[in-house]
Amino acid sequence: MIAAFQSPGATLELGFITLRWYGLLIAVAVFIGIWLSQRLARQRQIDPEQIADLSIWLVVAAIPAARLYYVAFNWGFYQKHLDQVVQIWKGGIAIHGAILGGIVAMAIFTYVQRLSFWQVADVVAPSLILGQAIGRWGNFFNSEAFGAPTDLPWKLYIPVPQRPPELINTAYYHPTFLYESLWNVGVFLLLLWLFRQPRYQKPGTLLMVYAIAYSLGRFWIEGLRMDSLMLGPLRIAQVVSLVAIALGSWGLFRLYYQGKPLPDWQTP
């Protein structure tokens, strides 16, 4: 029988140094992502140094965008606690905000550097989904982003302070962080396989597959969560996921059915 998951705490003590697991995992995801993207870039005849430069742009844009996205949809709380808006180390970022910020940064970078946006995006996409798989474990250490109550063998124990007020006596919940992390690993392996297939080399393919595959999993998992960002009765992440699936499907239809390239700054 699988034991219930339980976070050891949000911090890691190393002598006189205290690190927050959330921030540490983001840093690990960034460094692994840069390393992998540079390796993939060489296989697509893209200068790895340009990928390193792009990575700075992505980090500078994505992390603040992820935080602002989260704050915007939780403004009822943050307008009364403005001092907490910048306390990103405590958690509270939204991956869709990071993706949007990263896309804007990559669009500007590739335009300035006269690179193919889609070719660069295909190099970055596997690293992005792998980083998401790693980053989800930050939710585990923070005891956040969990799902509905459950008694399954792989249930997640949530401490009393983190439980919803209406479920204060309910201890175990779906480990949605684990579901999404495992799903993202599967998407990562799919993208790596596609990257090596000559028939799927059209620029934009991997980003479109990423948009569809990640969003399918996120739509389902979001339906289990207790803390979804909401706009009225709608779960924002599910709405964004449907839009991403539609855009990804359009992109693949254009590339492989119509045989047309996606609009780009520069022809690869």
From Swiss-Prot:
GO terms for biological process: lipoprotein biosynthetic process. Pathway: Protein modification; lipoprotein biosynthesis (diacylglyceryl transfer). Keywords: Cell inner membrane, Cell membrane, Membrane, Transferase, Transmembrane, Transmembrane helix. One of its GO terms (molecular function) is phosphatidylglycerol-prolipoprotein diacylglyceryl transferase activity. It comes from the Bacteria. It is an enzyme of class 2 (transferase). It is a multi-pass membrane protein. A 1,2-diacyl-sn-glycero-3-phospho-(1'-sn-glycerol) binds at residue 136. It is found in: Cell inner membrane. The chain crosses the membrane at residues 16-36, 56-76, 92-112, 175-195, 204-224, 236-256. GO terms for cellular component: plasma membrane. Its EC number is 2.5.1.145. InterPro entries: Lgt. Catalyzes the transfer of the diacylglyceryl group from phosphatidylglycerol to the sulfhydryl group of the N-terminal cysteine of a prolipoprotein, the first step in the formation of mature lipoproteins. Belongs to the Lgt family. NCBIfam families: lgt. PANTHER family: PHOSPHATIDYLGLYCEROL--PROLIPOPROTEIN DIACYLGLYCERYL TRANSFERASE (PTHR30589:SF0), PROLIPOPROTEIN DIACYLGLYCERYL TRANSFERASE (PTHR30589). This is Phosphatidylglycerol--prolipoprotein diacylglyceryl transferase. It comes from Thermosynechococcus vestitus (strain NIES-2133 / IAM M-273 / BP-1). The gene is lgt.
